[in-house]
Amino acid sequence: MKFEVNEVRIIEEEDGFKYYGIFDKGNKDWYEELKKFDKDTLKVMYNKDSYLVLSVDKDASKIAPTKAGDVVEEIKYQEVELAPNNYFVNSKIVKLKECETIKDGKIVFERDKRIEQIKKELSELKVEYSESEFLFKGKYWQRNREKGDRDSLTSLILLLTITGRKETNEWKLIDKDTREHVYPTLTLDDFKLMAFHMQSQLSKALKTESEIIARLKTLSDEELKNFNSRKEFEKLWKN
């Protein structure tokens, strides 16, 4: 049994009493039709365009279709957990998974949306890995942030080059063993080596991101659904 609302209009009886009449395309009255539903089934009301479940109840009289496009359909009784993401597809109540939508009454996986989602995750991982600290000269930890580290190092190398100074103890590092801030004396060549490490790490992060992105369009829907950005980034990073 199924009832689809086509029109809602005000009905006035002979005694002047008015109420909203609910009718299908055949002009059948909802208040009469609801009596024809099986008493033991679950009645599901959903929107015919979005398939979003609006209400469920075993008692058809407790279902209240109020506008055109509301559909009431009965299915075998089952316990249903009320949720804002319940949809009625192929006579079943389902929950859409991430990056799924409904088109023409069928659940469809949104590949492009999932790919863009993965790209965003990869972009964040690129920054995380490119800016992670690295071991310098075997005894110091150095971060690789664009604003706080790479830009400052470029300025310092330029200053030392212009002034002709060969070394300085103005650069802050982290001691490998104590994790305390230290200011060792470093030469211009030390800073150039540090800059090389920074650029190499940044380039590796960019390359890792690009290689993974290039693979995405070749993956199946199932592979995209189960794609773990961090796991794939780490795997390629270690190679």
Regions found by a protein language model. Name each.
Residues 1-41, 48-77, 90-239:
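A preference for well-ordered globular domain cores
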